[in-house]
Regions:
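Phosphate/nucleotide-binding beta-alpha loop and adjacent structural elements of enzyme active sites
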Residues: 1-295
């Protein structure tokens, strides 16, 4: 009898747990905390990039190490990577085209701004899609060095230009908080992970950068800079108004980031936002990445 009671209680708990998960998007919507819509909310998979990253890691091999960096052969090509950085997490994002596929992907001949280039995973994606020129913007010295080594031929050919600054709403300098995992490096001290080092990095606005480089146009902006997106976009108003680029923005860093980013972009020019993959935090559902298409 005791065993039967235990099995019954276990079944009740399992039933309630299943329906709690099933009903979460509805509850989130009723509370006004679902920015993805009920249908898209069911695609929110915790740690999806870790799952895909593990698959890519199993198909990759370490070629050599030098100066605290590692050279990896991966299904997406060779990449230099700082030791301790989760390379395969970001490669998984490109593997599933997290920053845009179909009409939201980089197009042949595009001039691309990669804001938050990290070690160059999206640089490779943009070049593979046929980009004419990729401006890799990465202020962290060790990550920038990886871009320099990985894309030495493309840099020499003029298809990639490396800018070792952080995009912001004004010029100057600012502290950047570095972690053992370079994915967490940020101007906004927001991670629970211990800070390994603090460095001072130069700041530049996107509008100034475009003018200094003499770019004839900007066709695509990808931005994933760990919560600094709103300030960086405030410094891109002229570029957005003038060139109306396709924009792909990481909006996963806080539940309110999607609304703030959308407001800034729409204040600059008419755009249609489209949710990419959905993510969740407690009862909040919001887009991991949002695609903005000029109208």
């Amino acid at each position: 009898m005791t065993i039967l009671k235990a099995l019954f209680l276990l079944a009740v708990v399992a039933y309630l747990a299943y329906h709690a998960v099933y009903l979460t998007p509805f509850v989130s919507s009723l509370l006004g905390r679902n920015q993805c819509g009920i249908r898209r909310s069911y695609s929110a998979i915790p740690d999806a990039n870790k799952v895909e990253g593990a698959k890519l890691r199993a198909r990759s091999r370490l070629i050599k190490e030098a100066d605290g960096l590692e050279l990896w052969q991966t299904p997406l090509g060779e990449f230099w990577n700082p030791r301790g950085n989760d390379l395969f997490y970001t490669l998984a994002e490109q593997w599933v085209r997290n920053y845009g596929d179909g009409p939201y992907r980089v197009k042949p001949g595009n001039i691309v701004l990669d804001c938050g280039a990290n070690v160059g995973d999206f640089v490779r994606e943009a070049l593979s899609a046929g980009a004419k020129l990729v401006i890799a913007i990465e202020p962290v010295p060790r990550s920038a060095e990886c871009v320099r080594r990985t894309f030495a031929p493309e840099i020499a050919a003029g298809r990639v230009r490396l800018v070792e600054k952080a995009v912001w709403h004004e010029a100057g300098t600012m502290k950047m908080y570095l972690h053992d995992n370079a994915l967490l490096d940020t101007l906004m001290q927001r991670h629970e992970a211990p800070v390994a080092q603090v460095v001072e990095v130069p700041l530049i606005t996107i509008d100034t950068l475009v003018a200094e480089l003499g770019l004839p146009r900007v066709d695509f902006i990808k931005m994933d800079i760990e919560g600094a997106e709103p300030n960086a976009l405030r410094g891109a108003r002229g570029t957005i108004q003038t060139f109306r680029p396709q924009i792909s923005i990481a909006t996963e860093h806080s539940p309110g980031e999607y609304a703030e980013v959308t407001k800034i972009i729409l204040a600059a020019a008419p755009y249609r936002p489209t949710c990419g993959r959905c993510t969740k935090e407690d009862l909040d559902f919001f887009p991991e990445v949002t695609f903005y298409t000029p109208q």
